[in-house]
Swiss-Prot record:
Organism: Methanocaldococcus jannaschii (strain ATCC 43067 / DSM 2661 / JAL-1 / JCM 10045 / NBRC 100440) (Methanococcus jannaschii)
Keywords: ATP-binding, Nucleotide-binding, Proteasome
Protein name per its UniProtKB record: Putative 26S proteasome regulatory subunit homolog MJ1494
Binding site for ATP: G161, P162, P163, G164, T165, G166, K167, T168
Function description: The 26S proteasome is involved in the ATP-dependent degradation of ubiquitinated proteins. The regulatory (or ATPase) complex confers ATP dependency and substrate specificity to the 26S complex.
One example of a Gene Ontology biological process annotation: proteasome-mediated ubiquitin-dependent protein catabolic process
Family indicated by similarity: Belongs to the AAA ATPase family.
GO cellular component, one term: proteasome regulatory particle, base subcomplex
SUPFAM superfamilies, sorted: P-loop containing nucleoside triphosphate hydrolases
Length: 371
């Protein structure tokens, strides 16, 4: 009886196989996973998938019949993608054997772990927005127990309000608090260069979300593709991406445990066909006096240098500022100034300087920026 010999990498082709060893076990089942090229010669990103499992089986058998493999080995494509490697994930029999004309192949696309690919957040980091938090509780309940809701699930939710008011932060907090996956997409990225690109991207987006459920799909800058037809000159030809997105929002596929949250600054400018797909609209407001003080105090504690100033004096002066404005445009420049001047604290003068930089000589905060 012949002994089976295994090699970690297989490169031989069918034409080289003259005889078969009848004593070798025949493989009934082989699961493959795309592994990539052994040498990367360009920046092109190749993604391998199959639309028809039957065709893939015919193709695979024709290439690899007679190959002897076990779990962990590699098979190399010799036709469409020369030298592209497929890793053998599992076989039956488990100890391995020879690929025959009866071997069944399955192409398994590796699932990407999305849970760690976003910055974690907590509700305690969100100052204010109490009404928004209340409305988001139903999303939390659904992500924690999708089967409880069935067809009554909160599937599509629209966050709207001025920039920097915590829409993305709220979505990240929802994902963190419920241990859900989180996929962030900028709407302009969904516009493809060629016909069919957009619909393919959106289809793959929701396939990833479904595989990673529970999952939040967060579509930022929705108005970039969802403007009303009244603004055709601004929106351009986005019919393909809009139609593909509407198909997903309509729930043609069940996608249990997947919630779509879209964000916009201008809900009134959205196409009614898109806006009507969102069963819930949640408003995010600019912080009031008390909330602005809490935001300043929260970020001041996180700064690498202590703030030696009475932050209450800046509450009225920052009226109309969002939480992001307070951090990025007010506190951060003040901190940088203190560091550049080799001081070990942020002074009132630093804060006044940063404020003057934002407002110039105007007395009123730039509320018009958020309309």
């Amino acid at each position: 009886m012949s002994k089976i010999g295994f090699n970690p990498i297989k490169i031989k082709s069918f034409s080289k196989i003259k005889t078969y060893d009848d004593t070798l076990p025949s493989l009934k089942y082989v699961v493959l996973e795309p592994a990539g090229f052994p040498i990367r010669v360009s920046s092109e990103n190749v993604k391998v998938s199959t639309d028809d499992p039957i065709l893939f089986n015919i193709y695979a058998r024709d290439q690899w019949i007679g190959e002897i493999v076990k779990e962990g080995d590699y098979l190399f494509d010799n036709s469409i993608l020369p030298d592209y490697a497929f890793k053998v994930i599992s076989t039956y029999p488990k100890e391995g054997g020879m690929i025959t004309s009866e071997t069944v192949f399955k192409l398994q696309t590796p699932k990407k772990v999305l849970r760690t690919q976003f910055k974690k957040a907590k509700f305690s980091e969100i100052i204010g927005q109490e009404e928004a938090k209340k409305k988001c509780r139903i999303i939390m309940k659904y992500l924690e127990n999708p089967k409880l809701f069935g067809e009554w699930a909160p599937k599509n939710v629209l966050f709207y309000g001025p920039p920097g008011t915590g829409k993305t932060l709220m979505a990240r907090a929802l994902a963190t608090e419920t241990n859900s996956s989180f996929i962030l997409v900028k709407a302009p990225e969904l516009i493809g260069e060629h016909v069919g690109d957009a619909s393919k991207m959106i289809r793959e987006l929701y396939q990833r979300a479904s595989e990673s459920a529970p999952c939040i799909v967060f579509i930022d800058e929705l108005d970039a593709i969802g403007l009303s037809r009244e603004y055709q000159s601004l929106r351009g030809d986005v019919s393909e991406v809009v139609n593909a997105l509407l198909t997903e929002l309509d729930g043609i596929k069940e996608n249990e445990g997947v919630v779509t949250i879209a964000a916009t600054n201008n809900p009134a400018m959205l196409d009614p066909a898109i806006r009507s797909r969102f069963e819930e609209e949640i408003e995010f407001k600019l912080p009031n006096d008390e909330e602005r003080l809490k935001i300043m105090e929260l970020y001041a504690k996180k700064m690498p240098l202590p703030v030696k100033a009475n932050l209450k004096e800046f509450v009225e002066k920052t009226k109309g500022f969002s939480g992001r404005d307070i951090k990025e445009k007010f506190l951060k420049p003040a901190l940088h100034r203190a560091i550049l001047e080799d001081r070990d604290y942020v002074s009132k003068e630093d804060l006044e300087w940063a404020l003057k930089k934002i407002l110039g000589n105007r007395r009123e905060a730039p509320q018009h920026l958020y309309l």
